[in-house]
Structures are given as structure tokens and as C-alpha cells.
Swiss-Prot record:
The keyword Kinase does not apply. Residues 377-461 form the KH-like domain. Transmembrane segments: none annotated. One of its GO terms (molecular function) is GTP binding. GO terms for biological process: ribosome biogenesis. Keywords: GTP-binding, Nucleotide-binding, Repeat, Ribosome biogenesis. HAMAP family: GTPase_Der. This is GTPase Der. PANTHER family: GTPASE DER. Residues 3-166, 203-376 form the EngA-type G domain.
């Protein structure tokens, strides 16, 4: 069993900074103001061949109301999940009433807890941590997480002995192999091999949309638990949360993202970070669920986000949420509006659901699997060339500069999204209308649904272009004799 280490403490004591250093990532958002982390975030850490799972949590300060209450609940859940707790305090700010309250709760849980005093760089650490002895948690470990000072000592003297106790050495290799395989699958860094089978990898599914359209509610409905903070206020989710799950004997990695709104309305520095994280999650995903609020309709920002998804080549499922409670007349108006504004995306399935009540949610994964299978299905060169030939016979390529464009053969150029490479003469001069015709013809012939398809064109090049003809010595002698003969004849 891989040990679980939770980082808890007041807001802005450096939990996310330490999380990023332990996991050697930038997965947790970090900035110099409180309340940045709202959901518990999991990361894999490895030190000297020992592995453990690290949980970053939102801060607890005892004055929570509204969404902050749910953040505190997430921190308490992380404590229950953990084998070891690192209780972080701010050495510069000194002992606070919230620190005392958290310490009291930790003592009642009887979890192995270690007190870590952060931000000790540039000050007398012994003097700065003196007040924290009153918490009664034993030894205090001073560190500077932003610079890494004291972190190695913390790992060697505190974490490693507990990791070895919870996870004996003989079990580490088996667990390490599992987590290495999982990490490669999630990060998408596996080397391509001839017998590659996309069904062996988890489907990375990103749930995106404008703020407060119900993304986290949908995530929790799918998972069957309050895994992500949900609150009726735009912008509750600020980070992208990666959650492994299994459904119908198929593995998934669910990515709940922050809402994306118009750039002019993004005034909060953290929200700018969150938008970047969301766009990165789209790039990282195999399939994207775009959630739209049925009551608000499709905004320009929805279309902008949709354009980014299509440009990224991600498979797409459109989810119209908050469908419950709408009258039949309003529903017809919404469907007409969808047909009008989304008519250019005829390959994506559209689902009408209520994430809050669960209606229609069960049908989403059939479309997700269909889109993923379409985007990763292997096609032979013979099949693609045959389809290309049929397309050119049904509708001949146009004339370019008085010559007919000739399509020679086609082959696969990549997957997720599927790419078809067509070779021929003057193919780069084809008009956009004929390129769209070819794309739609390939989509119908290959029965591709839920994913965009891309066509690339390559022209045959003259191998002797820009090369001067060089004569052999024998040819040079013949040339001299010929020139000499011509001169004599004159």
C-alpha cells in the first residue's frame, strides 16, 4: 500500500509550495494570498526510491462561511484519508488561534502528525518557532519550502521512516511499477509501439465550461460523492482536479476545471492562472465535455472555448445542463438556438441533462467512448487511398493554373485527432471548399463521430531540383571532342 501524506494548515502558510516541491510539479496554484487551494489535490511523490501520495488541501482558519466552509471540510476529509499529516504553520506570522484549533483537532484524530514551520528563510528559526512548542505536537521542523531549505532533512528524518513502516521494502517495487504505469498513462508520455492499444490507457476526460454552469456538480454526480467543492457562486473551482475512476470496466481520468469567461472580465490574478490551467487540461485530455447552461444559452465565450477545443483537436461531447424545470416551449427554443449556433459542429453528440438530479448523466459515457474510439482507431493506407479515390471520382478536383490537381495516395498521419495525409500534385493549391469536401467524405466513409478529422496535403518534390548536372570524366572528354569538331566545321 502506498502511504498517503496530507498537508494541512491555515491559508497561505505554503502548503501548495511544498506540494509542488514534493511532487516536482507545478500542479498546485501558488500565489501570495490566502484561499488559493479549494479542493484537495493528489500528487505522486518519490524520494530515494520510496513513493507516497501527497494531498494538498485548502486552508482552515476557523472563520469560514459559505464556500470556505466547504474548503475546510475538504481539508478534514484529507486528514481522514491520510496515513501521515504534515501540519504547516507560518513562522513569520507566529502562533495564531487557528493553529491552536487545528492542533487540537489533529490530536483528537490520533494520526501521526509532524509540525512543520515554513518561511524560516532570512530569520532566526529557533526564535521564530519557539511559540509553536505550546501546540504540544513534539519536534518542530523548520523549512523554507519556496527555496527547498530544510525539505530534504524533513523527508529523511520524518517521512522516510514512516513510509518504510507503512510500505515495507519488498512491496515498493510492485507499487512503484503500478504508479509509474499510471503516471505515464495520465501524462500521456508512453512511447508509441507497433502493437499500441489505446484501450489499455485510461480515457482522460476534461469537463469545461463557463463559471457556474454545473461542472463540479456533474463531476460529483459521475463519481457518486462530494469529491469537488460545489457552491452556488461562480468560480468555486480554481484549479484543475485530476480524479482516476472506473466505469463499466473502463478506466478514466476525470478532469474538473475552472470556469472560463471573457478575458475582459478576468480581474482576479488567480482566475487568470485558472484559465491557463483549464486550457492546459483541454490540451492534456482525450475527450472534452463542454457544459452549457440551458437557461443562459450559448454565449460568445462558449463559442470561443469551443474554438479552442477544436483547434486543439480534442474529441468533443456537448452537455446542455440545467434542462430540468424548463417548459416544452423553452426547450424547443433552446434546441433551435443550438442548431443555429452549433450547426458547423455536426460530428459532436449533444446531451440534455440535469447534473443536480442525475437525469441524462448515465448516457454521457457512451458518447465519450464513441468519441475516443473514433479518434484512436487505426486505418490502413489501402483503405484511406481507396476512400480518396472514390471521393475524387465522385467529385473531380478543380483545375489549378490550367492543370487538373492529381491525388496520388493517402495514409494515416496521426491519431487523437485522426489525421489523413494526402499526397499529389498541386494539392496545396486546392480551394478550401474542396478540402472541406474531402474532410466530410472521409468522416462519412470512416464513420468518425465525436472527434474532428484533419486533412494534410503534401506535394511530390523533384529530387533533382536545385541540383546542377555534373558530367563524368568520360562525358567531359566526349564534350571536348564535340566542341572541337564544331569549331573545325566552322
Amino acid at each position: 500500500m502506498v502511504p498517503v501524506v496530507a498537508l494541512v494548515g491555515r491559508p497561505n502558510v505554503g502548503k501548495s509550495t511544498l506540494f509542488n516541491r514534493l511532487t516536482r510539479t507545478r500542479d498546485a496554484l501558488v500565489a501570495d494570498f490566502p484561499g488559493l487551494t479549494r479542493d484537495r489535490k493528489y500528487g505522486r511523490a518519490e524520494v530515494e526510491g520510496r513513493e507516497f501520495i501527497c494531498i494538498d488541501t485548502g486552508g482552515i482558519d476557523g472563520t469560514e462561511d459559505g464556500v470556505e466552509t466547504r474548503m475546510a471540510e475538504q481539508s478534514l476529509l484529507a486528514i481522514e484519508e491520510a496515513d501521515i499529516v504534515l501540519f504547516m504553520v507560518d513562522a513569520r506570522a507566529g502562533l495564531m488561534p487557528a493553529d491552536t484549533a487545528i492542533a487540537k483537532h489533529l490530536r483528537s484524530r490520533e494520526k501521526p502528525t509532524f509540525l512543520v514551520a515554513n518561511k524560516t528563510d532570512g530569520i532566526d528559526a529557533d526564535q521564530a518557532v519557539a511559540d509553536f512548542w505550546a501546540l504540544g505536537l513534539g519536534e518542530i521542523y523548520p523549512i523554507a519550502a519556496s527555496h527547498g531549505r530544510g525539505v530534504t532533512s524533513l523527508l529523511e528524518t520524518v517521512l522516510m521512516p514512516w513510509v518504510d513502516e507503512i510500505n515495507p521494502p519488498e512491496e515498493i517495487d510492485e507499487d512503484a511499477a503500478y504508479w509509474a504505469q499510471f503516471e505515464e498513462a495520465v501524462e500521456g508520455k508512453e512511447e508509441p509501439v507497433d502493437d499500441f492499444n489505446p484501450q489499455d490507457l485510461p480515457i482522460k476526460l476534461a469537463i469545461v465550461g463557463r463559471p457556474n454552469v454545473g461542472k463540479s456538480t456533474l463531476t460529483n454526480r459521475i463519481l457518486g460523492e462530494d469529491r469537488v467543492v460545489v457552491y452556488d457562486m461562480p468560480g468555486t473551482t480554481r484549479d484543475s482536479i485530476y480524479i482516476p475512476m472506473q466505469r463499466d470496466e473502463r478506466e478514466y481520468v476525470l478532469i474538473d476545471t475552472a470556469g472560463v469567461r471573457k478575458r475582459g472580465k478576468i480581474t482576479d490574478v488567480v482566475e487568470k492562472f485558472s484559465v491557463i490551467k483549464t486550457l492546459q487540461a483541454i490540451e492534456d485530455a482525450n475527450v472534452v465535455m463542454l457544459v452549457i447552461d440551458a437557461r443562459e444559452g450559448i454565449s460568445d465565450q462558449d463559442l470561443s472555448l469551443l474554438g479552442f477545443i477544436l483547434n486543439s483537436g480534442r474529441s468533443l461531447v456537448i452537455v446542455v445542463n440545467k434542462w430540468d424545470g424548463l417548459s416544452n416551449d423553452v426547450r424547443e427554443q433552446v434546441k433551435e438556438m443550438l442548431d443555429f449556433r452549433l450547426g458547423f459542429i455536426d460530428f459532436a453528440r449533444i446531451h440534455f441533462i440535469s447534473a443536480l438530479h442525475g437525469s441524462g448523466v448515465g448516457n454521457l459515457f457512451e458518447s465519450v467512448r464513441e468519441a475516443y474510439d473514433s479518434s484512436t482507431r487505426r486505418q490502413s493506407t489501402a483503405m484511406l487511398t481507396r476512400i480518396m479515390t472514390m471521393a475524387s471520382e465522385d467529385h473531380q478536383p478543380p483545375l489549378v493554373r490550367g492543370r487538373r490537381v492529381k491525388l496520388k495516395y493517402a495514409h494515416a498521419g496521426g491519431y487523437n485527432p485522426p489525421i489523413v495525409v494526402i499526397h499529389g500534385n498541386q494539392v496545396k493549391d486546392l480551394p478550401d471548399s474542396y478540402k472541406r469536401y474531402l474532410m466530410n467524405y472521409f468522416r462519412k466513409s470512416l464513420d468518425v463521430m465525436g472527434t474532428p478529422i484533419r486533412i494534410q496535403f503534401k506535394e511530390g518534390e523533384n529530387p533533382f531540383a536545385d541540383k546542377r548536372n555534373t558530367l563524368t570524366p568520360n562525358q567531359m572528354r566526349k564534350r571536348k571532342r564535340l566542341i572541337k569538331h564544331i569549331k573545325k566545321s566552322k
